[in-house]
From Swiss-Prot:
Subcellular location: Membrane
Species, as recorded: Aspergillus rugulosus
Record's keyword terms, sorted: Membrane, Transmembrane, Transmembrane helix, Transport
PROSITE patterns: MFS (PS50850)
Lineage of origin: Eukaryota, Fungi, Dikarya, Ascomycota, Pezizomycotina
Family: Belongs to the major facilitator superfamily. Sugar transporter (TC 2.A.1.1) family.
Major place of residence: membrane
Pfam assignment, any one: Sugar_tr
GO molecular function: carbohydrate:proton symporter activity
Protein name per its UniProtKB record: Major facilitator-type transporter ecdC
Segments crossing the lipid bilayer: 51-71, 102-122, 129-149, 169-188, 195-214, 220-241, 333-353, 361-381, 387-407, 417-437, 455-475, 486-506
Topological type in the membrane: Multi-pass membrane protein
Gene Ontology CC entries for this record: membrane
InterPro entries given in the database record: MFS_dom, MFS_sugar_transport-like, MFS_Sugar_Transporters, MFS_trans_sf
Amino acid sequence: MRRNADLQVDGVDYSTTRLSHRWRMLKSQQRFFAWCQTLERPAPTVLTDRIMAGLWISTGVVMQGFDMVAGGQLAALPAFQKQFGAPVPDGSYMIPAHYLSTWNAIAPACEILSTFICAPLLERYGRKPGILAASIVSVAGVVLQQLATDWRVHLAGRGVNGETCRPELRGFFLCFFNTSIVFGQFAMSVAPGGWLAVYSLVCSAAVSRGSSLLSGKWQWWLPVVGMYTFPAILITGWPLFPESPYWLVRQGKVSEAQTSLRRIYGLHNDELCSVEVRRMEAEHQQARSIQGRLEQSNRRSILGFDSCAGVECFGYMHRKRTLTAILAASGQQMIGATFVIGYATYFLNLLHVRDYFDASIALYLVMLLASIAAFPLSEMVGRRAMIVIPQFVLCCMLLLIGVLGCVPDQRKASWGIVACIYIWAFIYEISIGAVGFVLASEIATARLRSATQGLVTATNAAWGLILQFTVPYMINPDAGNLGGRVGFIFFGTGLIAAIGGWYLYPETRGIPFAVLDELYASGTAPRRFRAVREQMMGVRRDPEADIPIHPQQLIA
């Protein structure tokens, strides 16, 4: 594309992809970073609007993180144990393993079902309507959980409740998805106040740590009632939320895409909006030309929805990309996230750790800080470097947890297990926990991105269904009672994910979607993407060869 002066915005040429521009883009596009609808207001008001808008955008994933650890947190509350558990000889109550398994497995089971229902709806009607529908359904789920007096009613409530960025900045902003989840997990563990005051307004009420100081049903009601905050925020801000510009471009609604971009960037950035729309159109057209179109007569439609996209994801041209995206997300579950994160408080309680709520608060704080650190590192270090080697380190930590679980004196060994869990959590959140979302979100071709993300969500939920159902049977005293030995199980599954990642994970940092299409179409080995990309840009980085590198020379 020819470079013209009208493509320069704040001294940056947006018609090209250059990693050296990412920090200047980030500085000049503050509105995109903390999106808001307000256009011209005094500076203090604009700042407040941007903060609140940024929090509003992340509300959905904060709610996901909040809900992911709700089962383990509630199971550790005495009032909840008394309401739904069975008495044990020492006079306390214990939640049976099959209750915990069913409660925690129902959400991913419903997530799998909703994925196949919602994915074609989102592709046809856009992303914005889905936010409103999900918020209304979430309210119904919270009501069922709050009013439940039987474990089956609580089960029903748990079940119900269960792409515009520049290439230079994709990793930075996609990492915020994971940080929002981690904040929700942290918020589920600590009462609002102090330096988390702003986020506490989002989370609204005191949660597990604060409610543990109460007695009676409000001890477990308070965390559940706090869930009303999230759909309330989403419904309130929904009228102001713009539709996805990328989706609008794919639908041929260019003028609406420009309007949506103006609302995101601000009216003073008309030039940038035009450049970005052209970039999205070019990527969309190039993706279609490289991957090819299936004849309309060969496509099948169900209720007006294209049913071939999911099958096409596993076709010859897309199979590797689909499996890479699935493994990048599912690898989180395989490496032990469900065990270490989802049941942290309950597991620490079973290990007889004193002040186990405080210990879990510290754990989620470590995870939050590590996830924040992943923001710049994903663009400075790259995706592959931040995932592949750390996955093998995580496997070693799981193996060590398993070994400590075999020590006869478990009261002493428990502190070693806790230390390993903390180290595991830090490495996980700074690596695959944050960057896995980045890779899974950007690896698919633009035309099949929605279908691929649906498959990623369904597969990840399937792993969640399996592990959420089985982990309580592994650790509960009335079942497997494995303790730290459960680390051996996740060491095995994690090693599979680590080895698969070594061969499948490419370096996608700063690579436009169209170039990714070319690299995959050429048959280039994913682990050599960076070298080939640098060769494409005229940068020689292969010291072992005296001739230029061609993509076909790097096929695995």
